[in-house]
Regions:
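ABC family nucleotide-binding domain
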Residues: 11-226
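ABC-family P-loop ATPase nucleotide-binding domain
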Residues: 1-21, 231-239
Length: 239
């Protein structure tokens, strides 16, 4: 797989009849019940639904943090279910960026060092990773904040650092799990406008989980989950 794949008629991500069951027998819990989702390169898709509807399980499968019980998950044409645990970890590290509700930054580490972490894991030379991290922070509007620790940043700034960290490796897809969940309305809108800009101007593929219809409206389309199923098909986002 390539970080920037050549044009391909197949979707970037294809979920077909994906089922996820936890437990066995009478204790079995069906988190996903045969869902089908296609995600094209450059898409911006929001997943919505009540707690327990299956959207977080779907996100974990997309991020190679979990595997389907049945069905097919293809990433750039590769059947993820046939990969070993180590191969899935490599796919996750090299092709998928993550943004979380809780930011997940190292508290006593500078913004620059937080953004550099994925590049350190890749073995990138210090000078090159410093430059890449600075570019990523500049792209999220944090030039001049490189030396500040997480404790010195607002919630919105911390999420910007987290987005820079997720994008510094130039992933094929960005998975954002409730990226505005810990922010007030004004900061939430700023983060969504930032994600929208990356999607429209740079063509970054984004999949987002949110409980907030106002935030989902920034996506190109919205997929509604209910009781482990995709409810009523896939609708275009309002905005």
């Amino acid at each position: 797989m390539n970080a920037h794949p050549a044009p391909n008629p197949a979707p970037l991500i294809l979920l077909h009849n994906v089922t996820k069951v936890y437990g066995h027998g009478q204790a079995a819990m069906h988190a996903l019940r045969g869902i089908d989702i296609n995600i094209e390169t450059g898409d911006f898709m929001a997943m919505m639904g009540p707690s327990g509807s299956g959207k977080s399980t779907c996100m974990n499968i997309l991020g190679c943090l979990d595997t389907p019980t049945a069905g097919s998950y293809r990433f750039e044409g590769v059947e993820v279910g046939t990969l070993s645990r180590n191969q899935r970890a490599l796919l996750r590290r090299n092709y998928i960026g993550f943004v979380f509700q809780g930011f997940n930054l190292l508290a006593r580490t500078s913004a620059l060092e937080n953004v550099e972490l994925p590049l350190i894991y890749r073995g990138m030379a210090p000078a090159r990773r410093h430059a890449r991290a600075r570019e990523a922070l500049a792209a999220v509007g944090l030039s001049g904040w490189e030396s500040h620790s997480s404790a010195e940043l607002s919630g919105g700034q911390q999420q910007r650092v987290a987005i820079a960290r997720a994008l510094v490796t130039e992933p094929a897809v960005l998975l954002a799990d409730e990226p505005t969940g810990n922010l007030d309305t004004a900061r939430s809108v700023e983060i969504m406008e930032l994600l929208t800009r990356f999607n429209t101007e740079q063509g970054i593929t984004i999949v987002m989980v949110t409980h907030e219809a106002e935030m989902a409206a920034f996506a190109r389309r919205v997929v509604q989950f209910l009781d482990g199923r995709v409810d009523g098909g896939q609708s275009a986002g309002p905005g």
